[in-house]
């Protein structure tokens, strides 16, 4: 029966690793994006003179009619002067042609740990990469649906900055056409990654005005610049949406390649997800919108929505708005903004285990202030929770070690007659009250916790560039010197020495290979995950040594 234990452990190891690889196949990107050399060396902030994005491409502006094709628009001259806005957490550039956000930096999140002055760039439309947030007014009289192209807005300043002591910053872009005055207003708040984008329509044309507000995210097919170099760290890169009838629906690039999505929904949100960061358009909850995904003529992927018809009588004024979130996947903040938006922190199919783990880990961190020590304390708590199961397992192993001479005698007696050997072993186990599979139970129970913690460490932006101590400066990437994986392999070897030797030579060889196999797998795993496994193994060794010695002492005492 001991062969079952060996096979089970080996199968769990293989299945766990295959699941990680499968996760990458399903949600990861095969190649990382080609980085713009100039962008990698620029100083922090948004550079001057970056060309504005394409304003007149037909695929940029959706049709207000859910049954029709995207509107065909003629291009107009591109804007050369971007409007720059800076708050304490955002640095962005707005193209006056259409009022799209074509660049966006996150100064609180450095692109690389060794260059803290260079912020991570979420949006970019000036080089080899395309990722931007677009919005406008389409429909019967919408200025973004004109044959001459999208509107050219004017701003009072070329740059805006949230001053010290200022809690809110408002940036107004103005445009007039045929007696209708438009103000596209961007409202920013201190310390917040969400902003309000509103349209104030003043109809002085003498005729009724009607149109629709649209908002969308456009991205090319390049890889995820926020993913790390550790094995198994490529998370989902693609679109997602939420509706009351279908909460949290992923729409991958492959899905968009197969055909666009078009649905009538109420409220909800549309988003683009990547490792650690998310961008989402959130319309008014009461609006009935047409959500659409499609691919434009340049091969860019688009997810967005078109709102209901807006009617403005002659001489009347109307305001319509939407919220844009562009920043880190901070669960507490996302949950406040819109129902289901926190699900963009994708913990996989074990989310119901991962979410409580993160909640507990976050509370531990609030006391300790270090994510590495928080992982260690979390491991101790999890180990304490599983102690009754572990103790039963170690008692079973200790009894197995005690009957090892009897098992060897059975092997000598029955030789190659495996059927009689198995029957004799079962009788011996029954007599000695030993469960031969008892040692597997903690592994079975802890494996879902291990995988859930893997996704917590992988998906939680709080782990990004989080140091522990000494050479571990980032728990979300691999150990740069492979010290933790080697320690983990050593602890597995020690733990193996405490276990009874399998009676079959082939089983024994397989078990001896397990520390080497696991060490190889863990060389490229996130350091935080390896830290958890090292601490878990050390605690297991201590528990097993203590229980084994107690049982051996009791056995000797009974024999005396």
From Swiss-Prot:
Which segments does the entry list as coiled coil? none
An example GO biological process term is: protein transport
The membrane spanning regions, by residue number, are: 1-21, 341-361, 367-387, 437-457, 468-488, 515-535
Q: Which InterPro entries match?
A: Membr_insert_YidC (IPR019998), Membr_insert_YidC_N (IPR028053), YidC/ALB3/OXA1/COX18 (IPR001708), YidC/Oxa/ALB_C (IPR028055), YidC_ALB_C (IPR047196), YidC_periplasmic_sf (IPR038221)
What are the entry keywords? Answer: Cell inner membrane, Cell membrane, Chaperone, Membrane, Protein transport, Transmembrane, Transmembrane helix, Transport
Superkingdom, natural source: Bacteria
Q: Where in the cell is it found?
A: Cell inner membrane
Could you tell me which CDD domains the record lists for this protein?
A: 5TM_YidC_Alb3 (cd20070), EcYidC-like_peri (cd19961)
The Swiss-Prot or TrEMBL record annotates one GO molecular function as: membrane insertase activity
The record's comment on protein family reads: Belongs to the OXA1/ALB3/YidC family. Type 1 subfamily.
- Please identify the protein, giving its name as recorded: Membrane protein insertase YidC
């Amino acid at each position: 029966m001991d062969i079952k234990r060996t096979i089970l452990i080996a199968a769990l190891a293989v299945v766990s690793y295959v699941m990680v690889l499968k996760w990458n196949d399903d949600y990861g990107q095969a190649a990382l994006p080609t980085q713009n050399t100039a962008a990698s060396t620029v100083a922090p902030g948004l550079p001057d003179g970056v060309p504005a994005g394409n304003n007149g491409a037909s695929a940029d502006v959706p049709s207000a009619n859910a049954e029709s094709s995207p509107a065909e628009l003629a291009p107009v001259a591109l804007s050369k002067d971007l409007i720059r806005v800076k708050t304490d957490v955002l640095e962005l550039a707005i193209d006056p042609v259409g009022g799209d956000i074509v660049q966006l930096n996150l100064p609180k999140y450095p692109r690389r740990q060794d260059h803290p002055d260079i912020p991570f760039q979420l949006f970019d439309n000036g080089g080899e990469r395309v990722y931007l947030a677009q919005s406008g007014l389409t429909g019967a009289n919408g200025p973004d649906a004109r044959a001459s192209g999208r509107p050219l807005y004017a701003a009072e300043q070329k740059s805006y900055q949230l001053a010290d002591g200022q809690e809110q910053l408002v940036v107004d872009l103005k445009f007039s056409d045929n007696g209708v005055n438009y103000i596209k207003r961007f409202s920013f708040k201190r310390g917040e990654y969400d902003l309000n984008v509103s349209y104030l329509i003043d109809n002085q044309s003498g005729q009724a005005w009607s149109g629709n507000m649209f908002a969308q995210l456009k991205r090319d097919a390049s890889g995820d610049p926020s993913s790390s170099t550790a094995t198994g760290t490529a998370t989902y890169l693609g679109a997602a949406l939420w509706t009351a009838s279908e909460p949290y629906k992923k729409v991958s690039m492959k899905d968009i390649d197969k055909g666009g999505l078009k649905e009538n929904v109420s409220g909800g949100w549309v988003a683009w997800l990547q490792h650690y960061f998310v961008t989402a358009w959130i319309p008014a909850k009461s609006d009935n919108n047409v959500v659409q995904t499609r691919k434009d003529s340049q091969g860019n992927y688009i997810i967005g929505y078109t709102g209901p018809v807006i009617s403005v009588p002659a001489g009347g004024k109307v305001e319509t708005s939407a919220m844009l979130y562009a920043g880190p996947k901070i669960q507490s903040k996302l949950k406040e903004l819109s129902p289901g938006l926190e699900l963009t922190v994708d913990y996989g199919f074990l989310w119901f285990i991962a979410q409580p783990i993160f909640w507990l880990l976050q509370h531990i961190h609030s006391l300790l202030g270090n994510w590495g020590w928080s992982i260690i304390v979390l491991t101790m708590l999890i180990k304490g929770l599983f102690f009754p199961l572990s103790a039963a397992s170690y008692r079973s192993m200790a009894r197995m070690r005690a009957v090892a001479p009897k098992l060897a005698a059975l092997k000598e007696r029955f030789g190659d007659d495996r059927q009689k050997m198995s029957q004799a072993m079962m009788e011996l186990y029954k007599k000695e009250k030993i469960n031969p599979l008892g040692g597997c139970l903690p592994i079975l129970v802890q494996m879902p916790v291990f995988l859930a913690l893997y996704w917590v460490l992988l998906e939680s932006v709080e782990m990004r560039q989080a140091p522990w101590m000494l050479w571990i400066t980032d728990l979300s990437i691999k150990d740069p010197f492979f010290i933790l994986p080697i320690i983990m392999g050593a602890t597995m070897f020690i733990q193996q020495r405490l276990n009874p030797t399998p009676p079959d030579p082939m089983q024994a060889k397989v078990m001896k290979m397990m520390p080497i196999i696991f060490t190889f797998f863990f060389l490229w795993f996130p350091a935080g995950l390896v830290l958890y496994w090292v601490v878990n193994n050390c605690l297991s060794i201590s528990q097993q040594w203590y229980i084994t010695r107690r049982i051996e002492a009791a056995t000797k005492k009974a024999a005396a």
